[in-house]
Amino acid sequence: DGSSWHDLFLSIEGPAVTRLARFFDGLRRWIASERPTLRMLLHIFSRRSDKSGSLRWLFNGPFSRLSPLTRTLRQDIAAASRLDMIQAYFSPNWGTLRRLANVEKRGGEMRLISAARSDNMTTIFAARHCYRRLLRNRIRIFEYVPQMLHMKLIVAGDAVYIGSANFDMRSLYINGEIMIRVDDA
């Protein structure tokens, strides 16, 4: 009946798991502290985001500047000659839409798979509102029909992002999100 969700799962082993556990330990200590502040929380997000490496954890929160996730993703999009995205919720700001369109303008290729069904139809309308600008720039857009889409996957050149962040304003600039970035995928 199409009421189930389609998602993506992965299994991670080794030192990357230890790094993620340290992030969650920091969150647990923040929650248990007598006076948790937003500044303390953002310090955890920033400090635990990996600055380099072929497998990097990138965390996001309500930063006044670009978060490690948003900054790294912008850099990868700017350098990508090929960009593929599967997004449950897709409603970036106009500046980000322009960056996506620039992939095609540079002679690259971009494809987007977005949700055709949702438990919140405003997210579908928001995504469709963004399509016109992308279609004018020859970006190929597909909507996933069989089930509700919950997947968040970005392939920008040789970098792959998988995690909790949708490609919308809340996920990129406000929500606490976790993405793993894998190089040379």
What spans do the regions from the language model cover?
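Charged, low-complexity intrinsically disordered terminal segments
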Residues: 1-185
